Amino acid sequence: MKTGALATFLALCLPVTVFATTLRLSNEVDLLVLDGKKVSSSLLRGAESIELENGPHQLVFRVEKTIRLPGNEERLYISPPLVISFDTQLISQVNFQLPRLENEREASHFNAAPRLALLDGDAMPIPVKLDILAITSTAKVVDYEIETERYNKSAKRASLPQFATMMADDSTLLSDVSELDTVPPQSQTLTEQRLKYCFRLADPQTRHHFLQWAEKQPPS
């Protein structure tokens, strides 16, 4: 990436976003969707946190934890996909607090009536709305973006309709260029949209590593 292109990318991305809330990740939480967008597992690999803007947010995730079975055996428990919505307007840090999940009985109770808490930096509970994401697709591989969009359009307990309208397929992204000074080729428009989104999700250290890598790339 050329230095000039990198500077343009940063000029587009950084001034319009203020990172004010840190979402601390948990190794027992598999984050699937953030604010209507699929979360890349490669992006989160090794990351301890995600930086968020102040305001309403929605997470779709699964709880994954090793539980004990009779006879000193163990198995990996994976919860149904859950939806949680909350507001970080006056919050600088968000932490997961999961209930005790050590055996089959506790896992069954969690499946039937999931409960967990989000805590701020002072370990105070954050108001949340929690629900199970009912999967409507019969496909072998679930598209959680689409399932989340359907959920947000259905006026459920943890629905946030604004994230349903923000969902966009490639054709929508290609036509949404109002924030750009000039209209680049379509493929570049889509690339910029995706790069900006991933850059916003990354924690400061990941962003720093990305910029170091980008500056070392030969001109295209």
UniProtKB/Swiss-Prot annotation:
Annotated signal sequence is 1-20
Question: Gene name?
Answer: yccT
Instruction: State the species of origin.
Output: Salmonella paratyphi A (strain AKU_12601)
Q: Tell me yes or no: is Signal among this UniProt entry's keywords.
A: yes
Keyword set, alphabetical order: Signal
Q: Name the family.
A: Belongs to the UPF0319 family.
The cross-references to InterPro entries, in alphabetical order and at most eight, read:
UPF0319 (IPR018635)
What PANTHER family does this protein's entry cite? UPF0319 PROTEIN YCCT
Q: What is this protein called?
A: UPF0319 protein YccT
